[in-house]
Design a protein with these regions (language model features):
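Glycine/threonine-rich beta-strand-loop-alpha-helix active-site module
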Residues: 120-123, 127-143, 148-182
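General beta-strand structural signal in soluble alpha/beta enzymes
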Residues: 16, 48-51, 99-101, 140-142, ...
């Protein structure tokens, strides 16, 4: 009896920290919806919203909002090698970028039924990192969730200029051949 009285008569500080609700709400939209419902039920409470990310889809937007930085588009390739514009978030003051690799090699970017893991790679992520370096970026904060790839960064390393060879000195062209790495 007294517990409910004190809960309703005292103002509380509430921190709302959601991730996205995949396919329905971004983390920011989820935080706003939760805050709206909470405020309707307990109008005296002090609410603070802090949308979060697990490093996958939505990571860039959450970090950009937190850091107060702007978006810039870069040409690049998705996990299947198709060209697209890839958003990154840049802080020119400290030569820093926020990279959401799901925007380059994300599972959500693939058409339905197109998930063939042996044909997908992170080459586009490497291309993006090269462009960021050319733009003066010195530090990257990367979210690497939501990926359609499992190439252990092989494609990214190749885009950055690394070469891999088998015991016969033949260059390895696909990550699935890494078991032959010398």
């Amino acid at each position: 009896m007294f517990g409910n009285f004190f809960l309703r008569s005292m103002s509380r500080q509430i921190l709302i920290v959601p991730d996205k609700f995949k396919g329905t709400l971004t983390a920011a939209e989820a935080a706003e919806a939760i805050a709206s419902g909470w405020a309707a039920a307990w109008p005296g409470d002090e609410l603070e919203q802090l949308p979060m990310s697990d490093g996958g889809d939505g990571f860039g937007e959450v970090m950009a909002a937190s850091l107060g930085i702007g978006e810039r588009l870069f040409p690049g390739a998705d996990a299947a090698g198709r060209e697209r514009e890839i958003p990154c978030w840049l802080n020119a003051e400290c030569n820093q970028a926020v990279v959401e690799t799901a925007q380059s090699n994300g599972l959500a970017l693939l058409p339905s039924g197109r998930f063939h893991p042996f044909e997908l790679d992170t080459f586009g992520v490497g291309q993006l990192l090269i462009q960021l370096g050319q733009a003066g970026v010195k530090t990257c904060i990367a979210g690497i969730g939501g990926s359609a790839t499992n190439d252990a960064g092989f494609g990214m390393a190749r885009a950055l200029g690394w070469r891999f060879f088998d015991e016969d000195g033949q260059e390895i062209q696909q990550w699935i051949q890494l078991d032959k790495l010398a």
